[in-house]
């Protein structure tokens, strides 16, 4: 079973993404961190005990990975075109407790599991070989958190909640 984990805004750069959320919601998103495996960086906004909004972009200070970046970020021209056309909320990420089973049944749509870390946080994330969103964002990116509580529980609570989708 898949459960909504987070919503992803893919930005041409972090400053633009954070400014967009500030303009829409009137608050500044706290910094998340860097993803060494993907050469990306994010800001995160808690939306509930196990739900958050992410702004993600290429980290200009990181080395480019030897593989495609997640969320379609290996194609900066497409990211920029999507951004300029108003396509900001690019997709959803859904968690599962059995990523291997899901990918065994539907790997052609979602790709393969990649191990990720950010500080003490660990997770596995399905990434297509080209790094693109499954079905151009019509399907969520599946993932599975490592041991411990959901990371949203440790994020600052700025009072934002997702009322519906």
Map each language-model feature to its residues.
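Active-site-proximal cofactor/substrate-binding loop regions of enzyme domains
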Residues: 1-55, 60-64
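Vicinal oxygen chelate
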Residues: 33, 44-46, 51-57, 74-84, ...
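Donor-sugar nucleotide-binding helix/loop cap in glycosyltransferases
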Residues: 59, 67-72
């Amino acid at each position: 079973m898949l459960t909504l984990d987070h919503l992803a805004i893919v930005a041409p750069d972090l400053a633009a993404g954070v400014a967009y959320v500030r303009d829409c919601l009137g608050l500044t998103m706290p910094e998340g961190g860097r993803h060494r495996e993907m050469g990306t960086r994010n800001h995160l906004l808690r939306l509930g005990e196990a739900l958050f909004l992410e702004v993600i972009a290429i980290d200009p200070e990181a080395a480019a990975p030897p593989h495609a970046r997640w969320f379609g970020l290996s194609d900066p021209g497409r990211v920029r075109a999507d951004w300029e056309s108003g396509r900001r909320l690019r997709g959803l990420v859904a968690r599962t407790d059995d990523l291997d089973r899901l990918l065994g049944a539907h790997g052609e749509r979602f790709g393969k599991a990649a191990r990720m870390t950010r500080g003490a946080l660990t997770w596995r994330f399905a990434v297509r070989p080209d790094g693109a969103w499954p079905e151009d964002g019509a399907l969520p990116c599946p993932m599975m958190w490592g041991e411990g509580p959901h990371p949203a529980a440790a994020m600052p609570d700025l009072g934002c909640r997702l009322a519906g989708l």
